[in-house]
């Protein structure tokens, strides 16, 4: 082989690119709830379903004050806060501040179970 380094780089690029194309996608609790109806209904009344709401100004003011946070500040774009209040923060196909997805703006199914797309094949059997 005349150019082993070129071959190695090409192989590495192919591995990276093919891996990203196959990455599992976060789909949001609404998608999960379309089949898992009772779980979805139960989840709606939990603090997890409203996790992103607590980052808004004047919401949960006492808790924010106790945590030495400004209760009047909007924390919905604060990367140090958002990660614990949404599904798949800054992960492939997950919630991002730059392009927020309302279906991922909560602590939903995928926070524990991982990206929903990986379950499609399992559920269709």
Regions found by a protein language model. Give the residues of each.
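Sequence context of c-type cytochrome heme-c attachment sites
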Residues: 19-105, 116-125
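N-terminal export/membrane-targeting signals
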Residues: 1-23
């Amino acid at each position: 082989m005349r150019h082993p380094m070129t071959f190695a780089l090409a192989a590495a690029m192919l591995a990276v690119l093919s891996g990203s194309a196959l990455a599992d996608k976060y789909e949001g609790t609404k998608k999960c709830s379309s089949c898992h109806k009772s779980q979805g209904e139960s989840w709606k009344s939990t603090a997890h379903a409203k996790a992103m709401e607590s980052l808004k100004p004047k919401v949960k003011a006492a808790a924010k004050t106790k945590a030495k946070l400004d209760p009047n500040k909007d924390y919905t774009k604060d990367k140090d806060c958002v990660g614990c209040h949404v599904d798949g923060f800054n992960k492939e196909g997950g919630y991002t501040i730059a392009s927020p997805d309302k279906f991922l703006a909560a602590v939903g199914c995928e926070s524990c179970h991982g990206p929903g797309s990986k379950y499609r094949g399992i559920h269709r059997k």
